[in-house]
Design a protein with these regions (language model features):
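A short, Lys/Arg-rich alpha-helix, primarily the initiator
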Residues: 2-27
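Short basic helix-loop element that most often maps to the first helix and adjoining turn
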Residues: 19-38, 63
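Recognition helix of helix-turn-helix/homeodomain-like DNA-binding domains
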Residues: 39-56, 77
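DNA major-groove recognition helix of helix-turn-helix/homeodomain DNA-binding modules
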Residues: 57-74
């Protein structure tokens, strides 16, 4: 992968993460300015994140996931990571 390929890939991923954040935020009827305030960032920075022009930190992604009721996996990859209980894991081992 060349540096140009990496930058294009990174920009695409950054955009997708921002779009997922924006969609969930709108679905939850949370104003961008309110989410920005919780994250202790300016509202224009929140806009840049949602439009794929800025990255979030890992702690910011965690807080966003908690506020929006999703996993960090969903924000990063668009897939919800399923967790299972210890009892379910033990049952699978028996099989």
């Amino acid at each position: 992968m060349t540096w140009t390929d990496f930058n294009e890939y990174n920009s695409d991923v950054q955009f997708q993460i921002g779009q997922r954040i924006q969609k969930l935020r709108i679905d939850k009827k949370i104003a961008a300015v309110d989410l920005a305030a919780v994250l202790d960032i300016q509202s224009n920075q929140m806009s840049r994140i949602e439009n794929g022009r800025a990255n979030c930190t890992v702690p910011q992604l965690y807080v966003i996931s908690q506020i929006l009721g999703c996993s960090v996996d969903y924000l990063l990859f668009g897939k919800q990571c399923l967790t299972i209980s210890q009892e379910q894991a033990d049952s699978i081992k028996v099989l």
